[in-house]
């Protein structure tokens, strides 16, 4: 517990008065004798000194409160989560496969899958592959559309 200087002076002022008269304001008493005698002090003076001590004890002292400097708190470092990284990698692989997939092309079966799917009967006729559609023209219509576009561009060269 911290004591102020004023509190220490009041404690030294409670000592018995010295035979030599003092002129200091903290040791001088207004109601007591200046010279030490064995005579008891009057009752009124004892009560007033008791009140004086209690009033000084309850007096508010100004305290200087020191707060720490305002420092930005650092958040604890987050541990890397392996499951999140693996999930992100899986999504990236699936996204790349979907992006690079060719539409309309059937994927051939692996040799292990082909042997298990084939019946034990020998195949006499060769297997014909389905007709491959052109990637640019996936419709069953003829290429009249391309000719119409060429004719339009010849008639209207400034259109595009």
UniProtKB/Swiss-Prot annotation:
Record field: transmembrane: 86-102
Region feature (Disordered): 1-35
UniProt keyword annotations, A-Z: Glycoprotein, Membrane, Phosphoprotein, Signal-anchor, Transmembrane, Transmembrane helix
PTMs per UniProt: Glycosylated.
Keyword Metal-binding (UniProt): no
Heme in keyword set: no
Tissues in which the UniProt entry reports expression: Expressed predominantly in the lung, testes and the uterus.
Residues the record marks as carrying a glycan: 137
Subcellular location, record wording: Membrane
Family listed: Belongs to the IER3 family.
Assembly: Interacts with the PPP2R5C-PP2A holoenzyme and ERK kinases; regulates ERK dephosphorylation.
Protein name: Radiation-inducible immediate-early gene IEX-1
UniProt lineage: Eukaryota, Metazoa, Chordata, Craniata, Vertebrata
Gene designation: Ier3
